[in-house]
Amino acid sequence: MTKQIIKGIIIERSSPLKIDELSQAVHLRREIIIEMVEHRLIEPEGSSPTSWKFDNVCLKRAKIAASFYRDLEINMPGIAIALDLLDKIEHLEQRLRTLERFENQE
Protein backbone atom coordinates (compact mmCIF):
# COMPACT_ATOMS: atom_id res chain seq x y z
CA MET A 1 0.00 0.00 0.00
CA THR A 2 1.37 3.40 -0.94
CA LYS A 3 0.81 6.50 1.11
CA GLN A 4 -0.02 9.75 -0.57
CA ILE A 5 0.61 13.08 1.10
CA ILE A 6 -1.70 15.86 0.06
CA LYS A 7 -0.85 19.42 0.94
CA GLY A 8 -3.01 22.48 0.69
CA ILE A 9 -4.50 25.44 2.43
CA ILE A 10 -7.82 25.02 4.19
CA ILE A 11 -10.12 27.89 3.44
CA GLU A 12 -13.40 28.12 5.27
CA ARG A 13 -16.45 28.79 3.20
CA SER A 14 -17.64 32.26 4.09
CA SER A 15 -19.33 35.27 2.66
CA PRO A 16 -17.29 37.52 0.36
CA LEU A 17 -15.03 40.08 2.00
CA LYS A 18 -15.11 43.83 1.44
CA ILE A 19 -11.84 45.61 0.72
CA ASP A 20 -11.31 46.73 4.32
CA GLU A 21 -11.97 43.20 5.60
CA LEU A 22 -9.48 41.75 3.14
CA SER A 23 -6.98 44.43 4.11
CA GLN A 24 -7.30 43.41 7.76
CA ALA A 25 -7.14 39.69 6.94
CA VAL A 26 -3.82 40.00 5.11
CA HIS A 27 -2.42 42.86 7.23
CA LEU A 28 -1.86 45.25 4.33
CA ARG A 29 -3.08 48.78 3.72
CA ARG A 30 -6.11 49.34 1.51
CA GLU A 31 -3.91 51.04 -1.10
CA ILE A 32 -1.83 47.88 -1.47
CA ILE A 33 -5.00 45.81 -2.02
CA ILE A 34 -6.02 48.26 -4.77
CA GLU A 35 -2.56 47.88 -6.31
CA MET A 36 -2.96 44.08 -6.22
CA VAL A 37 -6.23 44.41 -8.14
CA GLU A 38 -4.63 46.80 -10.65
CA HIS A 39 -1.91 44.19 -11.31
CA ARG A 40 -4.56 41.44 -11.55
CA LEU A 41 -3.11 39.49 -8.62
CA ILE A 42 -6.65 39.24 -7.29
CA GLU A 43 -9.89 39.78 -9.18
CA PRO A 44 -12.85 40.92 -7.09
CA GLU A 45 -16.44 41.17 -8.17
CA GLY A 46 -17.63 44.74 -8.53
CA SER A 47 -16.60 47.81 -10.45
CA SER A 48 -15.01 50.03 -7.81
CA PRO A 49 -13.17 49.60 -4.50
CA THR A 50 -16.30 50.49 -2.54
CA SER A 51 -18.30 47.73 -4.25
CA TRP A 52 -15.57 45.07 -4.54
CA LYS A 53 -16.28 41.65 -3.05
CA PHE A 54 -13.42 39.19 -2.57
CA ASP A 55 -14.08 35.45 -2.52
CA ASN A 56 -12.00 32.72 -0.85
CA VAL A 57 -9.75 32.35 -3.90
CA CYS A 58 -8.91 36.06 -3.69
CA LEU A 59 -8.22 35.67 0.03
CA LYS A 60 -5.83 32.76 -0.58
CA ARG A 61 -3.99 34.62 -3.36
CA ALA A 62 -3.88 37.85 -1.33
CA LYS A 63 -2.33 36.01 1.64
CA ILE A 64 0.39 34.56 -0.58
CA ALA A 65 0.93 37.91 -2.31
CA ALA A 66 1.09 39.71 1.05
CA SER A 67 3.77 37.30 2.22
CA PHE A 68 5.83 37.89 -0.93
CA TYR A 69 5.35 41.65 -0.59
CA ARG A 70 6.17 41.94 3.13
CA ASP A 71 8.64 39.13 3.74
CA LEU A 72 10.53 39.01 0.45
CA GLU A 73 9.98 42.62 -0.65
CA ILE A 74 8.93 41.54 -4.14
CA ASN A 75 7.19 44.19 -6.26
CA MET A 76 3.73 43.66 -7.79
CA PRO A 77 4.91 42.56 -11.26
CA GLY A 78 7.23 40.04 -9.59
CA ILE A 79 4.41 38.77 -7.41
CA ALA A 80 2.22 38.38 -10.50
CA ILE A 81 4.86 36.17 -12.12
CA ALA A 82 5.31 34.13 -8.93
CA LEU A 83 1.55 33.58 -8.53
CA ASP A 84 1.26 32.59 -12.20
CA LEU A 85 4.04 30.04 -11.77
CA LEU A 86 2.44 28.68 -8.58
CA ASP A 87 -0.87 28.30 -10.46
CA LYS A 88 0.90 26.40 -13.24
CA ILE A 89 2.65 24.12 -10.73
CA GLU A 90 -0.68 23.39 -9.02
CA HIS A 91 -2.30 22.60 -12.39
CA LEU A 92 0.56 20.28 -13.38
CA GLU A 93 0.43 18.51 -10.01
CA GLN A 94 -3.31 17.92 -10.49
CA ARG A 95 -2.70 16.50 -13.97
CA LEU A 96 0.06 14.26 -12.63
CA ARG A 97 -2.23 12.91 -9.88
CA THR A 98 -4.93 12.23 -12.47
CA LEU A 99 -2.48 10.39 -14.71
CA GLU A 100 -1.15 8.38 -11.77
CA ARG A 101 -4.69 7.34 -10.80
CA PHE A 102 -5.39 6.33 -14.39
CA GLU A 103 -2.12 4.37 -14.53
CA ASN A 104 -2.92 2.59 -11.26
CA GLN A 105 -6.31 1.46 -12.61
CA GLU A 106 -4.69 -0.48 -15.43
From Swiss-Prot:
Function: Interacts with CbpA and inhibits both the DnaJ-like co-chaperone activity and the DNA binding activity of CbpA. Together with CbpA, modulates the activity of the DnaK chaperone system. Does not inhibit the co-chaperone activity of DnaJ.
Database matches in InterPro entries: CbpM
Gene3D superfamilies xref list: 1.10.1660.10
Protein name (database record): Chaperone modulatory protein CbpM
Assigned protein family: Belongs to the CbpM family.
A Pfam family reported for this protein in Swiss-Prot or TrEMBL: MerR_2
